[in-house]
Amino acid sequence: MEQLKIMGGRRLEGEVTISGAKNAVLPILAATLLVKGTTVIDNVPRLRDVNTLLAVLNEMGAKAHFTAENQVSVDASNITNPVAPYELVRTMRASVLVLGPLLARFGQAKVSLPGGCAIGARPVDQHIKGMRALGAEVDVCEGYIEAKASRLRGQTLTMDVVTVTGTENILMAAVLADGTTVLHNAALEPEVSDLAHCLNAMGAKIKGIGTSTLTIEGVESLHPCHYRTLPDRIETGTLLVAAAVTGGSIVARQTSPQLLEAVLEKLEAAGCSIRRGADFVALEAKKPLQAVSLRTAPFPAFPTDMQAQFMALNCVAHGSAAIVETIFENRFMHVPELSRMGARIFIEGNTVTTFGVEKLSGAPVMATDLRASACLVIAALAAEGETVISRIYHLDRGYEAMEVKLRGLGAQIERIQEA
């Protein structure tokens, strides 16, 4: 199994190019199931989750593959097997996104209950509620969601809770339904808007994009399109925090600062100087950093996917701070690993309090989920001495060539085989 070996204490500086957003690419890949013909998607990161979903599409009968470094082609003309099997999707919760498209185009779907990060309950009840509201019969049997519908019908419905993948699944199902669907309490995340724009490029009729109420007028069929996904705001934030903890100065290119304003504001509160451009963000860190308290919430508030990275920052910042996690339970599994590195950190319920220390010490640590792995990389960059991070397959699920990008900024980091 592979590990990352990091020698801390190196200042990060230079420029780095941001990859396409995993959380935008995955639903758009699922949406290609709605179309007969070949759809081409640009700015696709080469990630484990992306490869898994391509394998799922191919298993169904599609022809899905990379045609260039960051370009994917999907021809879903001849889907013969509308099933997402457990063997393929057990590592990825986004697999449930094929439910809506399969049901809309083929009238049936069988999707294994999703796996992915071990960060508490991520229920699919809102997905099931949405499909039933559109007229589908849905059962959960032996670990699979099985759905059937002769024809989906437009409906007005309200999500009980804000859910990104739930919104996306209902959106994809509704575009081919009879009549108009009005979806209230829809997620506002930029990745949801990106999917909606892609669907409209395929011929869908979606209004209210970027608001909490989406109106979808069903159409008879969609057509292929050529679409470029938005940049990864979480990768952008992660690399900016990595630069901050090393007292660094970097420019993140091909990104969109308006997508992560809540993160940039917290970096400024920590003492960093931030410059925003149309397609770049520049950060210059001023030490000592100041600890920042924050509370995760749906977009446009502070994203849960940046919580762990800021916890690493707070561990080496001046003062104490509290981080409150409101989105997912059990998303503090990186705390014991930070403690191994010398962090002063305490959990009470859904709140973590940190008391900054002068320096962390390198240690062998283990990643437990995608963002926890990023947190440990950041902590290792700030630490004194060598850190070896195990289970970095979590990192590879969501970050494209992370060690290559960090090495380009001056980090001493290498991928090694576990002894």
UniProtKB/Swiss-Prot annotation:
Keywords in alphabetical order: Cell cycle, Cell division, Cell shape, Cell wall biogenesis/degradation, Cytoplasm, Peptidoglycan synthesis, Pyruvate, Transferase
Biological pathway: Cell wall biogenesis; peptidoglycan biosynthesis
UniProt enzyme class: transferase
Record: residues binding phosphoenolpyruvate: 22-23
Modified residues (2-(S-cysteinyl)pyruvic acid O-phosphothioketal): 117
Cellular component, GO annotation: cytoplasm
GO biological-process terms attached to the record: cell division; cell wall organization; peptidoglycan biosynthetic process; regulation of cell shape; UDP-N-acetylgalactosamine biosynthetic process
Molecular function as annotated in GO: UDP-N-acetylglucosamine 1-carboxyvinyltransferase activity
Swiss-Prot/TrEMBL catalytic activity: phosphoenolpyruvate + UDP-N-acetyl-alpha-D-glucosamine = UDP-N-acetyl-3-O-(1-carboxyvinyl)-alpha-D-glucosamine + phosphate
Positions of the catalytic residues: 117
Location of the protein in the cell: Cytoplasm
Protein residues bound to UDP-N-acetyl-alpha-D-glucosamine: 93, 122-126, 305, 327
UniProt cross-references to Pfam families, sorted A to Z: EPSP_synthase (PF00275)
InterPro entries: Enolpyruvate_Tfrase_dom, Enolpyruvate_Tfrase_sf, MurA_subfamily, RNA3'P_cycl/enolpyr_Trfase_a/b, UDP_GlcNAc_COvinyl_MurA
This enzyme's EC code(s): 2.5.1.7
Family: Belongs to the EPSP synthase family. MurA subfamily.
Alphabetical list of PANTHER family matching this protein: UDP-N-ACETYLGLUCOSAMINE 1-CARBOXYVINYLTRANSFERASE
Function: Cell wall formation. Adds enolpyruvyl to UDP-N-acetylglucosamine.
UniProt cross-references to NCBIfam families, sorted A to Z: murA, PRK09369.1
Protein name per UniProt: UDP-N-acetylglucosamine 1-carboxyvinyltransferase
Gene encoding the protein: murA
